[in-house]
Amino acid sequence: MDFIKLKKNLEKNGFKVSVFENACSAAEYLDREIDGMTVGMGGSVTMKQMDLYRKLSAHNDVFSNADTPGKTREEISREAQTADIYLSSLNGISENGELINIDGTGNRVSAIQYGHKKVYLIAGSNKVAKDYEAALYRARNIAGPLNAKRLGKKTPCAVKGDKCYDCNSPERICRGLSVLWKKPGGCEYEVVLIDEELGY
């Protein structure tokens, strides 16, 4: 993976970029950087593999649908939307530096766009694709079906596990699309690239 070229393109698009050899070193970096803050986390296999909730919740107030006890999903999502820091993995990233996420309820794609002091976007090497079309294809036809299956959805993509069927199922999880061509105004963004396969 040519992270040098990708880093250069992301920086040209206005993003701060950090590159790590493995998930452990990336998690240690984030654990050092984020301290004494309110932190929102989108649902993410990548971040679960990095054990970020456990690490960060030791010295931050963390809101994560997958991990925060004692609150409803809706309460957690609202608190995550207004947290100082927001963390999300990416479903796809092009070599040109375009960042793609697909969402079912919209909590993650909306939180990425606005409302925080800083947003960290995390991607393993498997999320990188040649161009925008390939990154979008990856998000819809690889990440989407695998996530639907993980969540126990009864959608065609989860059952067959091979591609997006653009279905009308009430359990469909790909309902909203976020594409960041350039760094949005209003807050700081950092893309965390990890030279390991992580998540879907």
PLM segments and residue spans:
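Conserved phosphate- and dinucleotide-binding cores of soluble alpha/beta proteins
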Residues: 81-200
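N-terminal active-site beta-alpha-beta segment that forms phosphate/nucleotide-binding
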Residues: 2-87
